[in-house]
Amino acid sequence: MSKRAFNFCAGPAALPTAVLERAQAEFLDWQGKGLSVMEMSHRSDEYVAIAAKAEQDLRDLLGIPSNYKVLFLQGGASQQFAEIPLNLLPEGGVADYVDTGIWSRKSMEEARRFGTVNVAASAKAYDYFALPGQNEWRLSKDAAYLHYASNETIGGLQFDWVPETGEVPLVVDMSSDILSRPIDVSRFGLIYAGAQKNIGPSGLVVVIVREDLLGRARSVCPTMLDYKVAADNGSMYNTPATFSWYLSGLVFEWLKEQGGVEAMAQRNRAKKDLLYGFIDGSGFYTNPIAVDARSWMNVPFRLADEKLDKPFLAGAEERGLLNLKGHRSVGGMRASIYNAVGLDAVEALVAYMAEFEKEHG
């Protein structure tokens, strides 16, 4: 096999090489059955076992309590922006939302189609370079839930704390930092995560929902979007994204082999410390995010002169450092260093950044 590049894409993101190699080995003939997972009936004993193991491994990794359902759904995280209010926001009700960047705003804008949204807090006052402390939040008295994004992939802000909401269910978009460090699932009413960053391939979204929040869907909620229907049918009300589910299960196995979420947190800390440390020590590269709000997963940075962006990216690609261009809405650079991106990738990136600075600084 030719040498694999270091992939810093924000999503679809890097997958563990060992996982891809196993999927490759099983692609034509899954465990001697003479067919691919992509050709299996989702109702077959073999596939039901694949799905059940994936769920159990995820439960083990995150310590998911028994009173939570784990759903493997289609539509990605963006579909959840509508699915959440359809299931949790009653007619005439209000939901609290925290605005920390593009993705949290998108979820907020979608929720407004279904009811009243109270912007409980916003990072706008800090130009989205810092998070508003909870003492600044203005929560509704009778909110159906409070929604926030734990990590903003574009802006590079991440919560290192869990909001306190009392009896109000806490709903979180963890698309880009789930499984990157330990969490207490019991603090949340609902967790959702698009798969294509830290879980597996695109086309799948994982929803972890407390059982008491099921059965609240509005009468106009499509059957396909009703969490209770999904839970009652084992995420198989219709044909699921079978291959994405299977491959995500292989990622969960790999994570357990690596030592679980605690071990990944140690690796991720080392990666982000190396990259931020280099940026902060440089007079050539900058990251504007407040230190206590910096993302472990998505590191945006700028060069001293934006005219150097194109040669920087060209040189990076020549060295097998791919997908470092920042999001089109903000520009600059962005290194996404999810679980499957090793320390060796970050070391190679830092070495190139130092070389480029020496030549152009």
From Swiss-Prot:
Its main location: cytoplasm. Pathway: Amino-acid biosynthesis; L-serine biosynthesis; L-serine from 3-phospho-D-glycerate: step 2/3; Cofactor biosynthesis; pyridoxine 5'-phosphate biosynthesis; pyridoxine 5'-phosphate from D-erythrose 4-phosphate: step 3/5. Its EC number is 2.6.1.52. It catalyses: O-phospho-L-serine + 2-oxoglutarate = 3-phosphooxypyruvate + L-glutamate; 4-(phosphooxy)-L-threonine + 2-oxoglutarate = (R)-3-hydroxy-2-oxo-4-phosphooxybutanoate + L-glutamate. The keyword Ligase does not apply. It is found in: Cytoplasm. GO terms for biological process: L-serine biosynthetic process; pyridoxine biosynthetic process. This is Phosphoserine aminotransferase. The lineage of its organism: Bacteria, Pseudomonadati, Pseudomonadota, Gammaproteobacteria, Pseudomonadales. GO terms for cellular component: cytoplasm. It comes from Azotobacter vinelandii (strain DJ / ATCC BAA-1303).
